[in-house]
Design a protein with these regions (language model features):
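Alpha-amylase-like alpha-glycosidases and glucanotransferases acting on alpha-linked glucans and related
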Residues: 23-169, 193-487, 495-497
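Short glycine/serine/threonine/alanine-rich loop segments
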Residues: 8-9, 184, 342
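Active-site pocket-lining segments that scaffold enzyme catalytic pockets across diverse folds
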Residues: 168-181, 185
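Conserved hydrophobic/aromatic pocket- or pore-lining residues that grip, position, or stack substrates
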Residues: 124, 179, 189
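Gly/Pro-rich turn-and-neighbor structural signature
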Residues: 172-173, 186-191, 196
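Catalytic domains of carbohydrate-active enzymes, especially glycoside hydrolases
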Residues: 1-19, 263-264
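Short beta-strand segments at enzyme active-site cores
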Residues: 10-15, 186-188, 267-271
Length: 497
């Protein structure tokens, strides 16, 4: 309602797929490509058949979200435990009390309609609880058929998990319909990969290459992390066996998109570059510390000659780039065909090959425009009025700090140099030692970034040579929203800066 009243056209969310039992799970490490996370279920009694309001007076505890917030704001394990306790009680009422007997057939019919993914998921959850981990390669039984036979002895627990998924879909579909009625599109997020510790990989292992872990090559934006600066980002996701997926016309991907668009009106594809080629590591993230100090030769010795590289082929030769372009075009067309007419956005940040963005525009998939990353060869910033219409303008994604933080960090570097008399009237002084050289270099970097921002939104020096304030905030976001991009967005925390 707030979004609609503020005339916001869409609300983008991070992935909402099931997260498993980890205390600090990432929404990009879901244990299923389809199943939804029950942590987000509403506990309004009218939204959960079987839930009785009196149960809230019987817990004896203050709900976790009503407790004083600590530095992490939400105690997710506590919220999960509290919600599951209440939902189990509701499930008991739902299946035993006669007033819910008329709804039970609808639930059973829904279960029948889901196909294999739901049974795989509920079995996987039972096995995770039984063996104490989602790391299935540590289980005493790793054969899918035999593991499923073990899970068959826990039908009641499986049924509870099925019911939770039914509730999740019903609630999300209600929200999606309501949002559509208020002219607000809910934007989902499809991660480029699935967790190695997922029901998909365990039960459909033939679709995944688990010998390699997907990630991204080393590049300057994450230089503060020594492993990322040296080797790149190792996300630990298995690679797709696209040739195997092609044998059933990419049914796994079609199913994934179909279920996403049941609850979202549009969606973002995370790290869309990997549809063309993906940077892969021959070791899991748990081994990053082992490989960090090694040379490439030493690393190759440990892996039998394998080193991080683009897969299925490199990206340097013309023939490689042509084939990568053809692959990406094919795979993205099949994704789009799974939900015709649904708007799609592609997160195309990082080391972007020059053939990717033209192809995305050809497919009508807007890519990202991060203003302070859009710099001309002469060093000036590209203005919003120069953006291609098929683009998505934003000052950052969930991986970024807020714009206020970026601005204040940059200005603080200038102020530090100024207080040390190393920066006078916008001009740096000549350093006399390495420490001063470092301080001046940081101030120059900060001034360059703020000047880009100022040029982007037309601010004068007397306005932008300052810490973040309402005038700067207004100018920055006004310029963003006036860009030629099809979409423009701000991070939710930025509303409160």
């Amino acid at each position: 309602d707030w979004t609609a009243d503020a005339h916001v056209g869409f609300l983008q969310l991070l992935p909402v797929n099931a997260l498993g039992r980890d205390e600090c799970p990432s929404p990009y490490s879901a244990i299923s490509s389809i199943a939804l996370e029950p942590l987000y279920l509403s506990l309004e009694p009218w939204t959960v058949p079987g839930l009785e309001e009196r149960v809230f007076n019987e817990t004896g505890d203050t709900p976790p979200w009503e407790q004083p917030s600590g530095p992490d704001l939400v105690d997710y394990p506590k919220v999960r435990s509290w919600k599951m306790w209440i939902l189990r009680g509701a499930w008991h009422n739902f299946r035993t009390k006669p007033e819910y007997a008329g709804i039970m057939p609808k639930f059973r019919e829904w279960v029948k309609e889901q196909g294999s993914w739901l049974e795989d998921f509920v079995c996987f959850q039972v096995l995770c609880d039984l063996f104490g981990t989602a790391i299935w390669w540590h289980w005493p039984e790793q054969d899918p058929a035999r593991a499923k036979a073990i899970a068959a002895d826990y039908e009641e627990e499986k049924d509870f998990s099925r019911w939770l998924q039914w509730l999740c879909e019903k609630q999300w579909e209600f929200i999606r319909i309501y949002a559509d009625e208020r002219n607000v599109k809910l934007m989902g997020d499809i991660p480029i990969g699935v967790s190695l510790s997922s029901s998909d990989v365990f039960f459909e292992r033939h679709l995944f290459n688990t010998d390699w872990c997907g990630g991204a090559p080393a590049e300057g934006n994450y230089a503060a992390d020594p492993f990322t600066a040296k080797w790149g980002q190792n996300w630990g996701i298995p690679l797709y066996k696209w040739d195997v997926m092609a044998q059933d016309n990419f049914a796994w991907w079609r199913r994934r998109v179909k279920y996403c668009t049941k609850i979202f009106s549009m969606y973002r594809i995370d790290h869309i570059l990997d549809f063309y080629r993906i940077y892969a590591f021959p070791w899991k993230p748990t081994e990053n510390d082992v490989f960090l100090p090694l040379t490439r030769e030493q690393a190759a010795e440990r892996t039998g000659g394998r080193l991080p590289a683009f897969k299925p082929r490199g990206d340097d030769q013309v023939w490689e780039r042509n084939m990568n372009l053809a692959d990406g075009d094919l795979y993205l067309r099949l994704v789009l065909s799974a939900a015709p007419g649904v708007s799609v956005v592609g997160e195309d940040l990082g080391c972007v090959p020059d053939y990717v963005r033209p192809n995305m525009r050809q497919l009508d998939i807007p890519g990202f425009k991060i203003p302070h990353w859009e710099i001309k060869p002469d060093g000036s910033i590209i203005l919003g009025k120069e953006y291609h219409e098929c683009s998505f303008a934003a000052f950052g994604t969930h991986d970024f700090e807020t714009l206020m933080q970026t601005w204040n960090d940059s200005y603080a570097k200038i102020e530090r140099a100024r207080k040390l008399n190393l920066w006078m009237g916008g001009v740096p002084k000549t350093p006399s030692n390495p420490e001063q050289e470092h301080i001046i270099k940081e101030a120059e970097d900060g001034a360059r970034l703020l000047k880009w921002f100022a040029d982007y939104c037309g601010m004068q020096p007397e306005t932008w040579m300052s810490y973040w304030n309402l005038e700067i905030k207004t100018a920055m976001y006004r310029a963003l929203f006036r860009s030629k991009s099809r979409y423009s967005a701000i991070l939710w925390p930025a509303l409160f800066d």
